[in-house]
Curated annotation (Swiss-Prot):
It comes from Homo sapiens. One of its GO terms (biological process) is Ras protein signal transduction. The keyword Nucleus applies. Belongs to the small GTPase superfamily. Ras family. It is an enzyme of class 3 (hydrolase). This is GTP-binding protein Rit2. Pfam families: Ras. One of its GO terms (cellular component) is cytosol. Keywords: Calmodulin-binding, Cell membrane, GTP-binding, Hydrolase, Membrane, Nucleotide-binding, Nucleus. Binds and exchanges GTP and GDP. Binds and modulates the activation of POU4F1 as gene expression regulator. Its EC number is 3.6.5.2. One of its GO terms (molecular function) is calmodulin binding. Interacts with AFDN, the C-terminal domain of RALGDS and RLF, but not with RIN1 and PIK3CA. RLF binds exclusively to the active GTP-bound form. Binds calmodulin. Interacts with PLXNB3. Interacts with POU4F1 (via N-terminus); the interaction controls POU4F1 transactivation activity on some neuronal target genes.
Length: 217
């Protein structure tokens, strides 16, 4: 799915020739990864989404007055290591690890997804943001804001609390990740030499997802 999105934090749509950012959504099933993605790209809240389905989406935005083309992989909510998971761990340039503030287990599982990234990339210096979703369900909160902030500080990454249902802070989370990627790109020894190889891995992964969808129809 490809949608051009005029994001709220940086008005205006991106022009041609935008830098492409390969983003991977991680987190336990049911935390709202797909709802966040759909709200970001199309300002729509899905009535239903199968948490076992992995899919890819594309959108263009402007972030800090620079065009950005986001290629977003919305993953299934299992923290097991698989061959396909290894592909998107290698191909992704940045990761959004999501949990639900109403589900303490999903918060605890965030560490498993962080470790999966390390198993493949062998470094913790990967662009990453931590997101606590479903803050519209405050009466059911099990994870405090302070706990989320503390974990983000441990990971040395950005932290956002969001509501996909209300489209609260959704743009901020995606924009924050792109800023982290751009920050890493300013250090060529860490990022620049790896971009071509990641692009090849990403294309291979997208082809695998397409075949899976075709087999399901």
């Amino acid at each position: 799915m490809e949608v051009e999105n005029e994001a709220s934090c940086s008005p205006g749509s991106a022009s041609g020739g935008s830098r492409e950012y390969k983003v991977v959504m991680l987190g336990a099933g049911g935390v709202g990864k797909s709802a966040m993605t759909m709200q970001f790209i199309s300002h729509q809240f899905p009535d239903y989404h199968d948490p076992t389905i992995e899919d890819a989406y594309k959108t263009q935005v402007r972030i800090d007055n620079e065009p950005a083309y986001l290629d977003i992989l919305d993953t299934a909510g299992q923290a097991e290591f698989t061959a396909m998971r290894e592909q998107y761990m290698r191909g992704g340039e940045g990761f959004i690890i999501c949990y639900s503030v109403t589900d303490r287990q999903s918060f605890q599982e965030a560490a498993k997804f962080k470790e999966l990234i390390f198993q493949v990339r062998h470094t913790y210096e990967i662009p990453l943001v931590l997101v606590g979703n479903k803050i519209d369900l405050e009466q059911f909160r099990q994870v405090s804001t302070e706990e989320g902030l503390s974990l983000a500080q441990e990971y040395n990454c950005g932290f956002f609390e969001t509501s996909a249902a209300l489209r609260f802070c959704i743009d901020d989370a995606f924009h924050g990740l792109v800023r982290e990627i751009r920050k890493k790109e300013s250090m060529p020894s860490l990022m620049e030499k790896k971009l071509k190889r990641k692009d090849s891995l990403w294309k291979k992964l997208k082809g695998s997802l397409k075949k899976k969808r075709e087999n399901m129809t």
